[in-house]
Amino acid sequence: MTERAVPTIPGFTAGYVDVAGLPTWHEVHGQGPAVVLLHGGFSGAAAWSAQAPALAGAGFRVHVPERRGHAHTPDVAGPLSYDVMAGDTIAYLEAVLGDRPAHLAGWSDGAVVALLVAQRRPDLAARLVLIGQYYHSAGRAAGRDLDQWLRSAAARDFLRQGYDPFSPDGPGHFPVVYDKTLAMIESEPELDLATFGTVTAPTLVLQGDRDVVTLEHSAAVAAALPDARLAVLPGSHALPLELPGVVNPLLISFLRGAVATPASAPGFLSNG
């Protein structure tokens, strides 16, 4: 099984933890208040490779779990849904942190999962960061064009490169995960923002101005949550990968309890 190189960080570990019977791969970096980073679809811990060391270096204990059917974590029979992934994440938090709250940061599908976790279990979410999130399919800028691309042979071959070297289920299982993930993306999430009034965690909604999510959609999320602000970074769409030099100080500042300002993360637009 191919492993990716990671920086040498005091307190770094990687391996499997039992989560309600599912062997779940995770990385743990550093020491301090807990931050849990939730990756997007067809991805894994590597998506946060520019953030985990920076957050650990800033004094956080960073947990990066990989969800069922992603990277090192095996698949589970049955359909995939955001509801299922939120349940898995709650079980992970309980298994690893007990009843202690953690800061949750999610990107793309991971942001949807983080939002659902904070809705269901506000006691587990200290602060919340939603990057490139979408609570409804209408908010995706690319819409059905993205769905069609994901069904293309080129997309399938590209996504397979991030699955085959890592999955304990073997490369032959990729078509199963591919089909169930696309079935989920094409029909979910269709969430009602009016139901998220229970999200009590201070929230940062973050996106690029060229993101797959419309600005209006993210503004609606920030307006609907009880304690949220929106930050838009110019000239980018895959923020954690493209702009870590801006994203990382912004995350650190927010997770430490400060309201993000242009001084703490230059080059972004914010609604305060």
Outline where the language-model segments fall.
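Active-site nucleophile elbow and catalytic-triad environment of alpha/beta-hydrolase enzymes
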Residues: 179-195
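Active-site loop/oxyanion-hole signature of alpha/beta-hydrolase fold enzymes
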Residues: 9, 49-52, 57, 63-105
